[in-house]
Amino acid sequence: MEYKTYKIADLIDEIAMGPFGSNIKVDCFVDEGIPVLNGSNLDGFALSEKSFRYVTPEKADSLKKANASRGDVVITHRGTLGQIAYIPQNSKHDRYVISQSQFRVRCNEKILPEYMVYYFHTALGQHKLLSNSSQVGVPALARPSSTFQQIEIEVPSVQEQRRVISIINALQAKIDCNNKINDNLQQQAQAIYTAMFISNADLAWEQGRLSDLITVKYGKDHKKLAD
């Protein structure tokens, strides 16, 4: 597989920061409308749509640069650094508003958004993404939009990108399936525990204290191990 090295600036058509905090106040939120993203929405490769707050379409229109749509990549620059996710083509909403702690990019024809996200989820990608971070106070990336554009990454042809994405997606689908199985088993185990020890507990069982069944012994400090 042949790679070419590009700066991010050569791989994107657009980059935009989230709105100033004063532009989205608590009283801007409504029960339904255009979703406003937060860190919990960027906890994987693709956008997670588990929980949102909303603003009206008119408010979203007034924050045009902060509007993200399908195919865009969203990155956290303040708070939980290292988060990066793409908005899939089958997302629930046509557009979203990124938060004041995020910025978004729109890829050009040289790179697929999924490939960019997968790259920055690798150890090398995370190192490059966080190389200009500051841990003083709230963790943040210094000059996020400009420093991100100067990052150099290795990119194969679009055809090879699609092949890589296909392999990763297949593996991720298996991981997701296994996670669902594990969740189901945990729920079954909890239900059995509740049925056996709470709902259907035998009234004839003897009650006592844990101290009646165990002996507690404490470890020693390393300096006293020779005693």
Features from the language model and the residues they span:
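Non-catalytic DNA-recognition/assembly elements of restriction-modification systems
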Residues: 1-20, 152-222
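A generic structural signal for short beta-strands and their flanking turns/coil linkers
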Residues: 33, 51, 99-101
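Extracellular/periplasmic catalytic domains that process cell-envelope and extracellular macromolecules
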Residues: 29-30, 96
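A short beta-sheet element
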Residues: 38-39, 57-125, 137-138
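A short glycine-rich beta-alpha junction/loop motif
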Residues: 2, 95-103, 134-165
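Residues on a specific face of well-ordered alpha-helices
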Residues: 6, 114, 118, 122-123, ...
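Sequence-specific dsDNA recognition surfaces
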Residues: 5-26, 40-73, 211-227
